[in-house]
A protein has these predicted regions:
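Nuclease catalytic cores that cleave nucleic-acid phosphodiester bonds
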Residues: 4-7, 16-30, 34-165
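Catalytic core of IPPT-family isopentenyl/dimethylallyl transferases
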Residues: 12-14
């Protein structure tokens, strides 16, 4: 071995133990209005009827979650509603959260992610840059609304192919 080879040998990489993959269900937290106003078809629907856009997103997430086998939590801001209490309803396999007065969807998602990501693989769908950084700090994976739309369309295509449509 020549001296030059020994001087230019890369140092061994430090071994950092990988975080174990959590057992149990995967969680998917979705910032509802962020997605509605990022997806063209939902935004157009919301221009005429916001409730219809919310229901359409709920149906989309039910199908997606059933196929991907994850626990979806869809969060809508209600922070401008005076005296509003947090409301959680179940719509098929989907949990829908309407935040309480003075609570944004981001605030709810940050708290939920902080708890869920300790024990479960957790993904957050939001195009809010600050939100993405915070949830990544809690150990969650982040997905932009646009990237999630592409993922949903791919799942819908797989479902149609499976059903032979």
């Amino acid at each position: 071995m020549c001296i030059r080879d020994s001087l230019h040998t890369a140092p061994a990489a430090a071994s950092v133990p990988a975080k174990p993959v959590p057992a149990g269900p995967d969680y998917l937290l979705v910032d509802g209005y962020n997605v509605i106003f990022a997806w063209d078809d939902l935004r157009k629907l919301a221009d005429g009827n916001l409730d219809a856009a919310r229901r359409r997103l709920m149906d989309i997430l039910c199908n997606y979650a059933g196929y991907r086998r994850c626990v979806p939590i869809l969060v809508f801001d209600a922070y401008k509603v005076r005296g509003g209490a947090r409301e959680v309803e179940q719509y098929h396999n989907l949990y829908v959260v309407y935040t309480r007065e003075a609570e944004t969807a981001d605030m709810y998602i940050e708290r939920a992610t902080h708890e869920l990501a300790k024990e479960h693989r957790t993904r957050v769908v939001s195009s809010d840059g600050a939100e993405q950084i915070i949830v990544m700090g809690h150990g969650a994976l982040r997905v932009s609304a646009r990237a999630f739309e592409e993922e949903v369309r791919a799942v819908e295509k797989e479902i149609r192919e499976f059903l032979g449509e």
